[in-house]
Amino acid sequence: MAKDIYFNEDARKSLLSGVEKLSNAVKVTLGPKGRNVLIDKKFGSPTVTKDGVSVAREIELENPFENMGAQLLKEVAIKTNDVAGDGTTTATVLAYAIAREGLKNVSSGINPIGIKKGIDHAVSLAAEKIRQSAKKITTKEEIAQVASISANNDSYIGEKIAEAMDKVGKDGVITVEESKTFDTTISYVEGMQFDRGYLSPYFSTNKENMSVSFDDAFILIYEKKISSIKELLPVLEKVLGTNKPLLIIAEDIEGDALAALVLNSVRGALKVCAIKSPGFGDRRKAMLEDIAVLTGGVLISEELGLTLETVEIEQLGQAKTIKVDKDNTTIINTGNKEQIKERSELIKKQIEDSTSEYDKEKLQERLAKLVGGVAVINVGAVTEVELKEKKHRVEDALSATRAAVEEGVVPGGGSTLIEVAMYLDTIDTSKLSYEEKQGFEIVKRSLEEPMRQIISNAGFEGSIYIHQIKTEKKGLGFDASSFKWVNMIESGIIDPAKVTRSALQNAASIAGLLLTTECAITDIKEEKNTSGGGGYPMDPGMGMM
């Protein structure tokens, strides 16, 4: 296919035009007075959102060169959202500001490579300053403030997220689901829960809701299948002597082994229940080892030289409470806290080393089941449109809150970026080249843009307030929702440090790419044939008589 090629100024201008269009669509959502964006859907109701990344994801431009610029900027929003869960609009505004100012300099003949080096130097110093300025958050109230701001100043959502995090801990799993009612509620699962139910309903101890409930029970954790009751007899006899219930977890339990267990359960000779092991493949063994650590037991595995016939009562796990229904099993643990902590640290290390998002998610779930349990936020709303929008806000707020717990918080409303710009003013740049100094200055000017946009969305002229904040004492900022000068941290106007830092670093990365672009190539669109159907051509000599 033939290609269309733009060089030098033409390439950069067309890319910047696309960046500007996407930035203009996204920036209207910034701040407490940010506006909504309505997105048409081919089927169903349109989506209403104030989430920058949701707006960015929808944008495709007709002009292919402009579209390339827009897609690059979209990458800033998506990457920031993936890393920090929020700050997508801030990142978009910063990227456009750096690219716009940078291209002005490139157009005047300054070497873009030098400008990029200056930008990278300034951003590196700025990111370190943001890290140093961060204040650790520990209280439930601080967590609620962060979550509220990320949920577009919805304090109810903020309180629910803080409540969930308080209950399951910072390593616990919090999931967001759609509620069947109009209300937003939280449900909790203590201990470890996994999606494996009993192998026979005859194990039920509660015939009304067909569930099994054991207190102070033993757990046999076996890696392979159990087909013969003979293998199990030694263990069953030992457990029978303690008069305690027994949960058997194995790859599968079948044949006369399952039949004998059901018979003993129905007759009341032994309180017993059998379930299949959770997970698949390598993950199955890891989860069985987790259960063993959680319950203070041993995984009975031939690799360790252990067989069912030689199992001692001390090698069985123990649980305070076990609940099993047809779909799920919940184990509330009594294991050794030191061993659980060691196992948790091992899983955390695996999360850090993993490059797969799917693996990270599964490891995070395992960690949560070990240390905290699971909280489910059920989001409710009156209409489907509102439900989608609200669920999205809750997910964003949850991600941002995790980022805040991880790296701490900084004053919000763009005031931290102004403080960072003032800090960059104090840096000695005498050893930098002229081009690098220009790049350094571009970052300083661009850091003002998010606050300027927040104030503009509130209906005021940003430049006046930015000049004023530079003369105010540290920590003060402009509250765009109440139109007052306040102490940002004390007023709860805070941003996760990770969000602010990631927004700036990702913005500078993409802006640097745009500045150093010298050629852009795209396919030439083929003209569609609009002529009539595909019949045979008429012979010119066969006209009408």
Curated annotation (Swiss-Prot):
A Pfam family matched in the record: Cpn60_TCP1
Q: Which residues form a coiled coil?
A: none
Main subcellular localization, coarse class?
A: cytoplasm
A GO cellular component annotated for this chain's UniProt record is: cytoplasm
Its annotated compartments are: Cytoplasm
- Reactions the enzyme catalyzes: ATP + H2O + a folded polypeptide = ADP + phosphate + an unfolded polypeptide
TM region positions: none
The GO annotation for biological process reads: protein refolding
- Specify which residues bind ATP according to the UniProt entry for this protein: T29, L30, G31, P32, K50, D86, G87, T88, T89, T90, G413, D495
Q: What is its EC number?
A: 5.6.1.7
Give a short account of what the protein does: Together with its co-chaperonin GroES, plays an essential role in assisting protein folding. The GroEL-GroES system forms a nano-cage that allows encapsulation of the non-native substrate proteins and provides a physical environment optimized to promote and accelerate protein folding.
Query: InterPro entries annotated for this entry?
Result: Chaperonin_Cpn60_CS, Cpn60/GroEL, Cpn60/GroEL/TCP-1, GroEL-like_apical_dom_sf, GROEL-like_equatorial_sf, TCP-1-like_intermed_sf
Listed A to Z, the keywords are: ATP-binding, Chaperone, Cytoplasm, Isomerase, Nucleotide-binding, Stress response
Q: Does the record's keyword annotation contain Chloroplast?
A: no
Summarize the subunit comment.
Forms a cylinder of 14 subunits composed of two heptameric rings stacked back-to-back. Interacts with the co-chaperonin GroES.
**Family listed:** Belongs to the chaperonin (HSP60) family.
Gene behind the chain: groEL
* Organism for this UniProt entry: Borreliella afzelii (strain PKo)
UniProt name for this protein:
Chaperonin GroEL
Q: What GO molecular function annotation could you give as one example from this UniProt entry?
A: ATP-dependent protein folding chaperone
